[in-house]
Amino acid sequence: MGAAAKLAFAVFLISCSSGAILGRSETQECLFFNANWERDRTNQTGVEPCYGDKDKRRHCFATWKNISGSIEIVKQGCWLDDINCYDRTDCIEKKDSPEVYFCCCEGNMCNEKFSYFPEMEVTQPTSNPVTPKPPYYNILLYSLVPLMLIAGIVICAFWVYRHHMMAYPPVLVPTQDPGPPPPSPLLGLKPLQLLEVKARGRFGCVWKAQLLNEYVAVKIFPIQDKQSWQNEYEVYSLPGMKHENILQFIGAEKRGTSVDVDLWLITAFHEKGSLSDFLKANVVSWNELCHIAETMARGLAYLHEDIPGLKDGHKPAISHRDIKSKNVLLKNNLTACIADFGLALKFEAGKSGGDTHGQVGTRRYMAPEVLEGAINFQRDAFLRIDMYAMGLVLWELASRCTAADGPVDEYMLPFEEEIGQHPSLEDMQEVVVHKKKRPVLRDYWQKHAGMAMLCETIEECWDHDAEARLSAGCLGERITQMQRLTNIITTEDIVTVVTMVTNVDFPPKESSL
C-alpha cells in the first residue's frame, strides 16, 4: 500500500511538471475594454499590462452578451491566477447558453479573439471568431498516458483502502457531501473573484469578492458546518425575506470536489462592516444613534413577525438566537441590517422549529434563562431571548454616543468591564443570573433627556423577567418617539419640554409578543 502510494505520487509530480512546462504561456499584456468606462472612469479600450506576484500565473479574460444575435462586449482585460484558465491559448466559452459569456486564456493579447463553443454543439462564433489551430496530438498523447496510469493506480489503491477499512469502524465522523447545491441566481454568472478576507467567525470566514461590476460578500463554510450553511440558506429562502433591514441574499453554491468541499453563501457587501467594528473606530451623535437603533429594531421586528398572505407565501416568525453587534451590518448611510442566520429558528404552523437546544449563541449575550437552562420552548420565549441581547447592543451604542455632557467611553463589549474578553459559561452565570448585574449605565447619561429615555428602554429590554421585556415592534416605536421628542428641545423651552416628557404615555412596558 505504501509503495503504491509513493509511486502514484511520483508519477503525478512528473506528469504535472511536464504538463506545466509544455503548456504554460506567460501573459504580459491583454486587450482592455470596458463598456461602462464613463461610470467607472476608465479608458474605454486599449492595452492593459498585467501585474501580479511572480509565483502567480496571469491571464486575459473577456465577458460579453448575446442579445438577439448581436454581440455586446462587457469587459476585457487581465485576470488573476485562476486554475480554470491554465494552458488555454484560446479564449473560448464552453458553458451551455449562459446569461453572461465568460472566457479566459494565457498569452499576450489572447483575449483579442473570443468565441462560444458549447460542448456537444456546433461552434457559434462571435463577431471576433477564433481561427482554429491544429491539434497538438503529441502533447495530448504524452499527457494522457501518465494520467491514465495515475487513474489506474488511484483506483487500485482506493479499492485496497476500502477493503481494509470494512473490517474496522471509523474513528472520526465521516465528511458528508451536502448533495447538489440549492438553486442560485449565481449559477451561470461569471466571474466571481475572491479579493480579501474581511472577517472570521465561528462558522467560517467572510470574503469581499467581485461579481462582474459590483462587490459582494462571500461567506465560506467548511463542510463540517454544513448545518449552519443549510439553515442560513433556508431562512433567506423563506417567503418575504427581502427587507431593507435584513441583509440582502444573492445566492448559495457548493464549490470544490466531493473530497474538499466549501459551502458558499453570497450576500450584499457593506463596506462599513459590522456595528461592532464601526463603534471601535467611531463615536456616534444622538441622531446617528437613533437611526441605527431604529433600523436595527425594524429589522428584528420584521424577523419576529408572522405574516400570512404574501404573494410568495406565508412568512413565519423567526427567532435569530445570536443577536450581537457583530451580526448587525451598517450600510453607507448607517442604516442597520440584521445578518447571520446560522442559528435562527423558524416557527411554521404544523412543523417542528428544528433544533431548539437552549444554550446556543454567544455567551456574553445569553439571556438569564438561557444561562440557567430554564427555557420555555415556545415561540415567544425565543423572541424574548433576542430582545435581551438587543438591550446589550443598545448599551454598546449608548456607550459611544456624544450626546451626554460627559466623556465618551472607549469601546467595550457588554460585561467586558466586569468579566473580561473571554468569559466562561460559569462567569456569565455568576454575574448575570446570581448577581443579576448588567453593564453600567453612566450617571451623566441621565442628564440628557434622550439618553435618559434610552437607558429606561435598555433596562426594559434586558429585564431579568423575560415576560416583562419589550417586543421588537414596541422598541422601534420607543426610539421613534425618543428622537421626535428630543428634536423639539431648544435652549428656550427645555424646562417646558422636560415637563412634557415626564407625562408621555410610552407604549406598554409588558411584552406584546
Curated annotation (Swiss-Prot):
S-S pairs: 30-60, 50-78, 85-104, 91-103, 105-110
Keywords: ATP-binding, Cell membrane, Disulfide bond, Glycoprotein, Kinase, Magnesium, Manganese, Membrane, Metal-binding, Nucleotide-binding, Receptor, Serine/threonine-protein kinase, Signal, Transferase, Transmembrane, Transmembrane helix
Transmembrane segments: 136-161
Segments on the Cytoplasmic side according to the record's topology features: 162-513
Gene3D superfamilies assigned: CD59, Phosphorylase Kinase, domain 1, Transferase(Phosphotransferase) domain 1
Residue stretches making up the Protein kinase domain: 192-485
Enzyme class, first EC level, given as a word: transferase
Membrane side Extracellular: residue ranges: 20-135
Record's catalysed reaction(s): L-threonyl-[receptor-protein] + ATP = O-phospho-L-threonyl-[receptor-protein] + ADP + H(+); L-seryl-[receptor-protein] + ATP = O-phospho-L-seryl-[receptor-protein] + ADP + H(+)
Annotated catalytic residues: 322
Binding partners and assembly: Part of a complex consisting of MAGI2/ARIP1, ACVR2A, ACVR1B and SMAD3. Interacts with MAGI2/ARIP1. Interacts with type I receptor ACVR1. Interacts with BMP7. Interacts with TSC22D1/TSC-22. Interacts with activin A/INHBA.
Family indicated by similarity: Belongs to the protein kinase superfamily. TKL Ser/Thr protein kinase family. TGFB receptor subfamily.
Role description: On ligand binding, forms a receptor complex consisting of two type II and two type I transmembrane serine/threonine kinases. Type II receptors phosphorylate and activate type I receptors which autophosphorylate, then bind and activate SMAD transcriptional regulators. Receptor for activin A, activin B and inhibin A. Mediates induction of adipogenesis by GDF6.
Name assigned to this protein: Activin receptor type-2A
Recorded name of the encoding gene: Acvr2a
